[in-house]
């Protein structure tokens, strides 16, 4: 019997996170801090609250992880030009230098996860995931 949707998504999430952790280990990164770097790359100057919205994590978890990444030299916090009470987050030279490897790992895991699906199925699957995520976001 097929598992329910939530169970399937939970297992898929765990498998992808485990695979990412394995591939990121030689870079001294984990799937958690990897995703922070990818978001900061796409939105340089993002605030911690903006990061929390994109990653869907609580503010205290974001603060701890951002502080850890800054201490490790992957990102830097600058005072926001728009709001002096907030920090704007940017990749450091070290963080920028590792991006090609992070992109390659992302592509590898995407290929592995979707290997049994045709291109049309992959596109449909991604659209369904997006629609499902938007449904939850809009339920506030």
Question: What positions do the PLM features span?
Answer:
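Charged, amphipathic alpha-helical coiled-coil/dimerization segments
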Residues: 17, 67-130
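N-terminal positioning helix adjacent to the helix-turn-helix/winged-helix DNA-binding module
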Residues: 1, 5, 32-33, 94, ...
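N-terminal leader segment of winged-helix/HTH proteins
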Residues: 1-27, 74, 136
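Short capping segments at the starts of secondary-structure elements
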Residues: 43-47
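Short alpha-helical "packing" element that flanks the helix-turn-helix/winged-helix DNA-binding module
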Residues: 36-37
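Residues within helix-turn-helix
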Residues: 48-49, 60, 67, 87
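Residue-level detection of the helix-turn-helix DNA-binding "recognition helix"
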Residues: 21, 25, 56, 67, ...
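The alpha-helix within a helix-turn-helix
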Residues: 52
């Amino acid at each position: 019997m097929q598992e329910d949707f939530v169970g399937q998504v939970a297992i898929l999430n765990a498998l992808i996170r485990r695979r990412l952790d394995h591939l990121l280990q030689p870079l001294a990164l984990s799937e958690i801090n990897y995703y922070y770097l990818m978001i900061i790359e796409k939105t340089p100057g993002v605030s911690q609250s903006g990061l929390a919205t994109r990653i869907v994590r609580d503010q205290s978890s974001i603060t701890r992880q951002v502080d850890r990444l800054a201490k490790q030299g992957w990102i830097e916090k600058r005072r926001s030009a728009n709001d002096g009470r907030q920090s704007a987050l940017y990749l450091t030279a070290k963080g920028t230098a590792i991006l090609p490897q992070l992109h390659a790992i992302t592509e590898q895991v995407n290929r592995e996860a979707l290997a049994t699906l045709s291109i049309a199925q992959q596109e449909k699957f991604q659209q369904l995931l997006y629609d499902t995520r938007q449904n939850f976001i809009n339920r506030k």
